[in-house]
């Protein structure tokens, strides 16, 4: 996949559920539609929670790297 232009990076390393998703929600609110938030996490629950959050809140999970920590998620605000 080509390079994704990230608007903001959110480091949630060391945080455990539900903190990473709460911070994603708080930070993505400040982005405009189409802007991209890169989330870096090491909580295994994020592999389930972040895709579910995107679906529920109508954001787009562009790409994720979840083979081994730290996990990375590129989330575009909106569809």
Swiss-Prot record:
Gene3D superfamilies: TusA-like domain (3.30.110.40). This is Sulfur carrier protein TusA. GO terms for molecular function: sulfur carrier activity. Sulfur carrier protein which probably makes part of a sulfur-relay system. The keyword tRNA processing does not apply. Coiled coil: none annotated. Its main location: cytoplasm. The active site is at residue 17. Keywords: Cytoplasm. One of its GO terms (cellular component) is cytoplasm. It is found in: Cytoplasm. One of its GO terms (biological process) is tRNA wobble position uridine thiolation. InterPro entries: Sulphur_carrier_TusA, TusA-like, TusA-like_sf. Belongs to the sulfur carrier protein TusA family. The keyword Nucleotide-binding does not apply. Pfam families: TusA.
């Amino acid at each position: 996949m080509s390079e994704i232009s990230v608007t903001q990076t959110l480091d949630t390393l060391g945080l455990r559920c539900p903190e990473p998703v709460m911070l994603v929600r708080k930070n993505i609110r400040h982005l405009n539609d189409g802007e991209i938030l890169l989330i870096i996490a090491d909580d295994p629950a994020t592999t389930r929670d972040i895709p579910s959050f995107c679906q529920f809140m109508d954001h787009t999970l562009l790409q994720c790297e979840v083979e081994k920590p730290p996990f990375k998620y590129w989330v575009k605000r909106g569809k």
